[in-house]
């Protein structure tokens, strides 16, 4: 009787400490289908049950992130939508989360620190995470929940980073039928269609006007200047590196410029610099040519013409000074050692 009791006790302990915590693939699939994005949330009460092995040939990918503005994790914000795209790509081809070439399944989970004022998720404490984002993959027959592999997250952005993550998942799981499906961006197609339609219509209805516009020196000068300003403001750099629009500061504020960084920038920095350079160029043109044009067409016979010219020139010079001060402020933010600031205009740009 004692022998039978001991055997039963050992069997019960072994089952309850290891397999009982594990979830079947069907249960994981039900949890994934309950989520709108097919991502299983790792709650404090259930994350151990979800991640604990064995998983019946199921690999589980877990993202630990913190999108709270107070944290200031710009990479977390970037990875948020990229992770959604990766998960959607897998489930679009595999609605049952199972590979077409094998019995292997892949599920995706996530725990997010959205409000630092509340308690830190237990999953963060359990895995002793000191930084985010972190990407783990749990194998089906690992000895314990702590036996997992880390998927490195590169500094590349957009599709390149998503492809690298998918490639890492394929290597760990030996699943070959995992492809990235990027959502179709209809904006450039619709924009190109509308512009083409309007251009063809104008050429058909107003051919003389369109040819006069095309042959206009002013139009070509404006377009050439705008192109040069965009290039010197790192527009091409943004297109090549696919830089993020803006950053998040330590207090949750929006960052327009990367301090002390001449080699890196946010995309919005290009927009600000185009505005500054474009305004300066326009003001110089108005100062040199515009005032004369206004005088000859609006007040050619006015006795106080020179007085009006002086007022307009003074306003142009004042605005040139203000925008040039903004330009030097940007240089000061990018390099605090820059010794020639004109005005303290740093507040709008930080």
Curated annotation (Swiss-Prot):
Q: Where are the transmembrane segments?
A: 183-203, 218-238, 274-294, 307-327
Q: Which domain of life is it from?
A: Eukaryota
**What pathway does this protein act in?**
Protein modification; protein glycosylation
| Additional free-text comment from the UniProt record | Present with 4030 molecules/cell in log phase SD medium.
Q: What is this protein called?
A: Dolichyl-diphosphooligosaccharide--protein glycosyltransferase subunit 3
Physiological role:
Subunit of the oligosaccharyl transferase (OST) complex that catalyzes the initial transfer of a defined glycan (Glc(3)Man(9)GlcNAc(2) in eukaryotes) from the lipid carrier dolichol-pyrophosphate to an asparagine residue within an Asn-X-Ser/Thr consensus motif in nascent polypeptide chains, the first step in protein N-glycosylation. N-glycosylation occurs cotranslationally and the complex associates with the Sec61 complex at the channel-forming translocon complex that mediates protein translocation across the endoplasmic reticulum (ER). All subunits are required for a maximal enzyme activity.
Originating organism: Saccharomyces cerevisiae (strain ATCC 204508 / S288c)
Location in or out of the cell:
Endoplasmic reticulum membrane
Q: Where is the Thioredoxin domain?
A: 29-171
